[in-house]
Amino acid sequence: MEVNILGLIATTLFILIPTSFLLILYVKTASQEE
């Protein structure tokens, strides 16, 4: 089986970017409530 490196990188970025964005938003709102 041949692994498509570009596809793997694209999928990783596609998952990591929104996740980190939501995580930053959550941390900001959580720190504001305290």
UniProtKB/Swiss-Prot annotation:
Ubl conjugation is among the record's keywords: no
Assigned GO CC terms: chloroplast thylakoid membrane; photosystem II
InterPro entries: PSII_PsbM, PSII_PsbM_sf
Gene Ontology terms: biological process: photosynthesis, light reaction
UniProt cross-references to HAMAP family, sorted A to Z: PSII_PsbM
Function, as annotated: One of the components of the core complex of photosystem II (PSII). PSII is a light-driven water:plastoquinone oxidoreductase that uses light energy to abstract electrons from H(2)O, generating O(2) and a proton gradient subsequently used for ATP formation. It consists of a core antenna complex that captures photons, and an electron transfer chain that converts photonic excitation into a charge separation. This subunit is found at the monomer-monomer interface.
NCBIfam families: PS_II_psbM (TIGR03038)
Protein name (database record): Photosystem II reaction center protein M
Native source organism of the sequence: Pleurastrum terricola (Filamentous green alga)
